């Protein structure tokens, strides 16, 4: 729904729409809604209209949320002023949006677990900072307050020796030997999914936590609040889907190196495993088995009979894995 339609209905900054809490200010719309149990999905855009994309999330059953919009009063410069604060509760998760648009998330015990980093002075730096780019979208920087003692785990597979990611900056992009999965768990009792496919960066600083997307039309993240990692992962899987069971061969012993140059070299290794009576599920011939880049056939100068090779491996109970 657009800003214009909201303005026709009410002058309030907040609106309860079906099972969601919505805030609008200037051209920005913020929408918070339940997405599975004990979780809240937060979206925002400066364009005045949110997309209908679910991205990595499944369209699962939404829990019934409790939404409250409260009027509050303060005296400033001798004048009584009215403002609104809104709340949405889904199981363990409670989000508050204050008069300045700052979002704070609490657990079921009322403990603060995540808070946007809004800086009103001196530059009025927003927590949700959208900067127009040349692609017709925005470069987005999302900033949160940081607990220096918090421990953070996850985010996929990186070539770093750190289990606790506190103090790390991670590139959110896939590379050879790097698989970026923008989901982390905190020892403060929550899981967080950055639900955007854009290339970007995540920084888990001691003074601030930041997520950056190089090009996007909106902000989108999911926060799951639970007491144990098991509960967090269970809700996370309900939200994004469950991985199928791997085939049996994939759970066996793999042999790989960088790389096998010829068919004879690979088969000599496979036959030696058989001679030693070591079960071999997969042997990976790896890259550059092809004649030219982009032509991913076997190079017959070095791999003269791939069919015969594959059949012999199959008789051994071994699969020939190759890249790509």
Which positions does each model-derived feature cover?
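N-terminal accessory segment at the very beginning of proteins
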Residues: 1-250, 256-258, 263-265, 269-271, ...
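Ser/Thr/Asn(+Pro)-rich, low-complexity disordered segments
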Residues: 275-276
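Short, conserved phosphate-binding/catalytic loop or strand-edge motifs used
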Residues: 286-292
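Aromatic-lined substrate-binding rim segments of carbohydrate-active enzymes
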Residues: 293-318
